[in-house]
From Swiss-Prot:
Residues 164-441 form the CP-type G domain. The keyword Ubl conjugation does not apply. GO terms for biological process: nuclear export; protein transport; ribosomal subunit export from nucleus. Keywords: Cytoplasm, Endoplasmic reticulum, GTP-binding, Hydrolase, Nucleotide-binding, Nucleus, Phosphoprotein, Protein transport, Transport. Residues 344-359 have a biased composition (Polar residues). One of its GO terms (molecular function) is GTPase activity. It comes from Rattus norvegicus. In contrast to other GTP-binding proteins, this family is characterized by a circular permutation of the GTPase motifs described by a G4-G1-G3 pattern. This is Large subunit GTPase 1 homolog. Residues 288-327 have a biased composition (Acidic residues). Pfam families: MMR_HSR1 (PF01926).
Length: 655
């Protein structure tokens, strides 16, 4: 027997525990000054359903907040605003866009560019610089006041005074001021106040709008824009620097091939060809100080020969009426001589009032149009100066390089690449002046429109959703799928079946197709957005804004043509009786796999399975009998086909 314990001495702990349990179970508590968790002086949490809530929709979050607000619940509930997911696109609704357009038309007269203050020879450089700063500051305050009072959004215009000073100098020294605009949206890049400022400086100066990238427009679209500007009394010229460069390069290659084929004919022909090649070099190296009168005469003869060659081009075939007018006029001038042509130009008043033509002009036609536009007194005697101005990335430098015949001006896809104006002599008496690109103040609905128009750099954008949403709104779903060969997810059953795809749907499909993935295995939407937006700016995804009064959907002839070509291709493919070979795509992985010289099967375990031995392939009867020889079976001498791990054998296939 063990030692007997004192009665009640060891049960004190159990008594305390039992008392605490009974106290917690009892509902009759006496008031106490002790601070315990059982005080009934707070909110009764027991009546609530304590269910964890980690995610709430916007509506549930609002209703929960309104319920917590108590007395303000009714007032807040009356102001409920349902925000659909499409609101994140950053685009305006139809009603908002119409309202903003009306405000733009009402306040368009307040948009202006800064003027250079009046100066004369007595004005010192310091006084002129201070006056320019004062006028520039006043101009900026006027635009800020317009934004604050009218609640309008202006484009992020140029705020560097030095760029505007270069524009002033280009306008002052130019006889013809050419605004280069993008053919896909000419009204966005056109500045009407710039035309007024040119006339304010000198009424003899001429304004011309050069619609670049006009090869992206169809003939019907060019006619519509020509008629629109004709009604407004503005001279326009349709031009494509890229298409003309390709055309000139093709002609030069044909000339080189023809010269190489006729090189062995006679020595006299070789000497004449050498004489014709020298003026072409003078075209590239021409300057005002180094050329003599003899070289000028040779240059003019060469240019006349090139004009005759150009008139035999396919321009007459594409537009016979206009080709007869242009070509016939030039031939008459060549036949009757320069004196008759000058008399004809003085006699006909049509040269001062030119009608807008919708055909694409060539390099020589463009230079001839410049010479015909300005016939009055020039800023510099004996020299016609043509100033090229406009927004960034509309093709000013590309136009100069095409006219000059080689790379005279640096070109970049990034807007604002040209930093300083420069003058270049095309021929004696004709000078081109390139001005840096200026973002002039204009009304805009959203910043996404400026990114899609190429005004703002794509690589510097912060939010990719609004511009991609604008692309989805302008380009139909079927055109996007046909262009990239992707399948965009269809709208749900409770959605509009004809709604445009969202930016997330397009970027997800494009990213999966191109393999643009993030570190977490999701499609890289920002990277895909940069590719799609650059295709939109380049014209691969083509959308052309119509003139005022035209239906934007009916104006997109290229979309219908693309879809018709796709439907015709599918019909030809599905025609019975025509077996077309399936297009075989050469895959490097498949080609390497099926051309292996050593192919073997691997099995698990150490025993041979159906004639196969691990690591050695098929086991023959002779080899099996040789292995069963008496001796030391545990010795495996010369075992070169021992079992190896599969991950070592095929580690070259691991990615």
């Amino acid at each position: 027997m063990g030692r007997r314990r004192a009665p009640g001495g060891g049960s004190l702990g159990r008594v305390l525990i039992r008392h605490q349990t009974q106290r917690s179970r009892s509902h009759r508590h006496t008031d106490s000054w002790l601070h315990t968790s059982e005080l009934n002086d707070g909110y009764d949490w027991g009546r609530l359903n304590l269910q964890s809530v980690t995610e709430q929709s916007s509506l549930e979050d609002f209703l929960a907040t309104a319920e917590l607000a108590g007395t303000e619940f009714v007032a807040e509930k009356l102001n409920i605003k349902f925000v659909p997911p499409e609101a994140r696109t950053g685009l305006l609704s139809f009603e908002e866009s119409q309202r903003i357009k009306r405000l733009h038309e009402e306040n368009r007269q307040f948009l202006c560019i800064p003027r250079r203050p009046n100066w004369d020879r007595k004005t010192s450089p310091e006084e002129l610089k201070q006056a320019e700063k004062d006028n520039f500051l006043k101009w900026r305050r006027q635009l800020v006041r317009l934004e604050e009072e009218q609640k309008l959004i202006l484009t992020p215009f140029e705020r560097n005074l030095d760029f505007w000073r270069q524009l002033w100098r280009v306008i002052e020294r130019s006889d013809i001021v050419v605004q280069i605009v993008d053919a896909r949206n000419p009204l966005l890049f056109r500045c009407e106040d710039l035309e007024c400022y040119v006339k304010e400086i000198d009424a003899a100066k001429e304004n011309v709008i050069l619609i670049n990238k006009a090869d992206l427009l169809t003939a019907e679209q060019r006619v519509a824009w020509a008629v629109h500007f004709e009604k407004e009394g503005v001279k326009v010229i349709f031009w494509s620097a890229l298409a003309e460069t390709v055309h000139l390069n093709g002609d030069s290659k044909d000339e080189v091939n023809s010269v190489a084929g006729e090189a062995n004919s006679s020595e006299s022909e070789d000497s004449s060809l050498d004489g014709n090649e020298i003026p072409h070099r003078d075209l590239f190296l021409l300057s005002e100080e180094s050329e003599s009168d003899d070289d000028d005469s040779e240059y003019e003869d060469c240019q006349e020969d090139e004009e005759e060659d150009w008139q035999t081009c396919s321009e007459e075939d594409s537009n016979p009426e206009e080709g007869q007018e242009e070509g016939g006029c030039d031939r008459d001038q060549k036949e009757h001589g320069p004196e008759d042509s000058e008399a004809q130009s003085r006699a006909s008043p049509e040269n001062s009032q030119m009608s807008n033509k919708s055909h694409l002009v060539s390099k020589q036609e463009l230079l001839e149009l410049f010479k015909k536009l300005h016939t009055g007194k020039k800023v510099k005697d004996g020299q016609l100066t043509v100033g090229l101005v406009g927004y960034p990335n509309v093709g000013k430098s590309s136009t100069i390089n095409t006219i000059m015949g080689n790379k005279k001006v640096s070109v970049s896809a990034t807007p604002g690449h040209t930093k300083h104006f420069q003058t270049l002599y095309v021929e004696p008496g004709l000078c081109l002046c390139d001005c840096p690109g200026l973002v002039m103040p204009s009304f805009v609905s959203t910043k996404a429109e400026m990114i899609c128009s190429g005004i703002l750099p794509i690589d510097q954008m912060r939010d990719h959703v609004p511009p991609v949403s604008l692309v989805c709104q302008n380009i139909p779903r079927r055109v996007l799928e046909a262009t990239y060969g992707i399948n965009i997810i269809k709208p749900g059953e409770d959605e509009d079946p004809y709604r445009p795809p969202t930016s997330e749907e397009l970027l997800t499909a494009y990213g999966c197709m191109r393999g643009f993935m993030t570190a977490h295995g999701q499609p890289d939407q920002p990277r895909s957005a940069r590719y799609i937006l650059k295709d939109y700016v380049r014209g691969k995804l083509l959308y052309c804004h119509p003139p005022p009064g035209k239906d934007p959907v009916a104006f997109q002839h290229q979309h219908r043509q693309l879809l018709e070509n796709k439907i015709k291709g599918e019909e030809l493919r599905l025609q019975p009786g025509k077996t077309q070979k399936a297009k075989q795509v050469e895959n490097v992985v498949d080609k390497t796999f099926f051309h292996q010289e050593n192919v073997r099967a691997l099995t698990k375990g150490v025993q041979a399975v159906m004639g196969y031995k691990p690591g050695s392939g098929l086991v023959t009867a002779a080899a099996a009998s040789a292995e069963n020889v008496p001796g030391k079976p545990w010795k495996k001498h010369g075992n070169r086909n021992k079992k190896e791990k599969s991950r070592r054998l095929y580690r070259h296939l691991d990615v």
